[in-house]
Every structure is written in structure tokens, then in C-alpha cells.
Amino acid sequence: MGTGFAIGAVLFAVTGIVTVLIWPRERSSAASVASVEFSDAIAKLDVKQLLRSFIPPTKNCRDFYFALMGRLLLILGWNMISGYQLYILQKYCGLSVKDSAATISTMSVISMVVLIVTSMVSGPLSDRLQRRKVIVAIGSVIIAIGVAIPCFMPNALGMMLFAGIGGAGYGIYIAVDQALNVDVLPSQEEAGKDLGILNLANTVGQVLAPVVVGAIVLATGSYAALFPIAVVAVLLGAVFIMLIRKVK
């Protein structure tokens, strides 16, 4: 344990020093045209304009909200399982604490490898095919398949298959979903605000997952019901994505 912390401290120190040494040196932008225009805009900003800037889009925003719901549901379904792996392995699969820890380590390696590979492939493929929503939906369906496996294999192998198949789908999803979100923005003038709203789906999904999981476990006394409900959430997310019209 002590050696691990020491190695981590050295790595943090070295990377910090290297970053400072090689960081690009740029001249101050204080006198640039963009900086002056930004300062003028801040000076003219009033309270009404500020409050209006926080209002979600209301025009030409059908696809925007479908993308928002698609992301929210997928993140919810994914975190219902990935965020509770330890409890699922112990209470649902019947593994000991030691075996659960070892299984989670293996799952982490599996999911990391497949996520990197699929994200590296699906991003360029999406650009080449000029397809966004279809690839995002395919990734969602693959995630749903991975989530469904432990329903029929309530053991360590089933969870490892979840990590592999679900991780592959998640890699496809995260590589293309943000590009899809950019394509459905209703206004280029408010792109930053609207992207911020879309990204809130990540946080809301992660916050809702413990609430939903806790309610299900309390109601059923088991973790078994998590899997079908998570599958439904992810597939509903795919449906919302496919309902988008603006993007292929």
C-alpha cells in the first residue's frame, strides 16, 4: 500500500513538472479584438439578459430534447449496473468480498480495453459514413444486451460479459453521442448554453441511478430486478435517439 502511494505521488509530481515545462507560451490576449468585444458585451449585459440566457431552448428544439432524453435514459440505465457492481457481485452473484474485488478488477480491465477499441473505431466510422444517430442507437442496443446477460447468468462470468459487451457498446456511444448533440443544437448563437443543458443529462442520470436502485432493492429485496429495468431504460434511450429527424 505504501509503495503504491509513493509511486502515485512521484507520477503526479513528474507529470505536473513536465506539463509546466512544455506548456505552450502564448502572449496575453488582453488587447485582442475578441477580448475587447467580450468586455463590451459584459458591460452591456443586464439582469434580464442574464436570466434569459439560462432559459432552455423553446424553438426548433424537438430533436434537442429527444437527444437529451436519450442520453439521460442511457446514463441512468448504465449507472444502475456499473455503479453497483460490488453489491451485485456479493448480493446477487453470491461472491465473497475477496472474489468480488478480484472480479471487479478484471471487469475494469475488460471494459477499459473494449471501450478504447470501440471508441477509436466508431468515431472515424461515423465520420466516414456521415451517420450519427444510427451508430449511437446501435451502441445503446449493445449496452442493453450486455446489461441483460446477468439476468440469465447470475455469476462472475455473466458480469464479465456485461463488462465486455456493455463496455463495447458504451465506447461506441460516447465516441459519437457528443457529435450527435452538436448536430441537434437549435441555435448556434446559444450553442454553449444548450450543450451545457445536454451535458446535465450525465449528472442527472448519475444522481437518479442511486435513487432508482435504492427504491427497487427496497421494494423487491433483491438486485435481480435492476437488470430488466436498466435494459428498458437503455432501449428507451435508443428509441428517443432514433426519433431524431435532423440527423441521419
PLM segments and residue spans:
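Multi-pass alpha-helical transporter architecture, strongest
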Residues: 16-22, 173, 208, 228-248
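Structural signature of the two symmetry-related core transmembrane helices
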Residues: 134-149
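A membrane-interface helix-boundary motif in multi-pass transporters
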Residues: 1-10, 215-234
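Juxtamembrane intracellular "pre-TM" segments in multi-pass secondary transporters
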Residues: 26-69
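A late C-terminal transmembrane helix in Major Facilitator Superfamily
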Residues: 189-219
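Intracellular juxtamembrane helix-capping segments at the cytosolic ends
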Residues: 172-186
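Short amphipathic helix-loop junctions that connect adjacent transmembrane helices
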Residues: 83-102
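Helix-to-loop junctions at the C-terminal end of transmembrane segments
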Residues: 118-131, 217
